[in-house]
């Protein structure tokens, strides 16, 4: 089964690598050097030459630069585009068939993974280029609330609505001058959104 890439941009945030790609027997026949490199990485014996054989989309060379393999399980580490993929990206760190580079090996061997990283199981397909919203997605694994906040960052109108709602809630929670809490109810949403039209 061929895995069709959705993007060929280097450092994009890639898909979840649920497409397994060519079978192991097919890989052994068509790309014996690459399969040997993957086997060596299983025992932490990969070399710089193996890194070149596997390659990546960014390297524009090697097994993982080819459309047929780029989004397959074998390339889930080198093409993930996810920060600390070997530490926090399950399709990479939980997949015995994903090639881990010498750099990945050194980070894991020397226990250099940042503490507190969430293991991302549910990453969906999305694009990005390493900006702060991508960083937020990577570390928070695309949960519903975080996806909403990321989308807000990319839409000024939604950002304005979110700021206004937060300010209204803070204002209502502040104690009144008499030391009592303001028990007024929040204005109905229709009133809030009608006031936005005045901006």
From Swiss-Prot:
Q: What induces it?
A: Expressed in the late phase of the viral replicative cycle.
Q: How is it modified after translation?
A: Contains intramolecular disulfide bonds.
Which top-level group of life is the source organism from?
Viruses
Q: Name one GO cellular component term.
A: host cell membrane
Q: What coarse category fits the chief subcellular location reported for this protein?
A: virion
Membrane-spanning segments: 150-170
Query: Does the keyword Magnesium belong to this entry?
Result: no
Record-level GO BP terms: symbiont-mediated activation of host autophagy
Per UniProt, what is the membrane topology?
Single-pass membrane protein
Tell me where in or outside the cell this protein is found: Virion membrane; Host membrane
Which UniProt keywords are present, listed alphabetically?
Activation of host autophagy by virus, Disulfide bond, Host membrane, Host-virus interaction, Late protein, Membrane, Transmembrane, Transmembrane helix, Virion
Function in brief: Essential for viral fusion with host endosomal membrane and core release. Not required for virus morphogenesis and egress. Induces complete autophagy through the interaction with and down-regulation of host PYCR2.
Q: Report the sequence similarity comment from the record.
A: Belongs to the asfivirus E199L family.
Q: What is its quaternary makeup?
A: Interacts with host PYCR2; this interaction results in autophagy activation.
Q: What is the name of this protein?
A: Inner membrane protein E199L
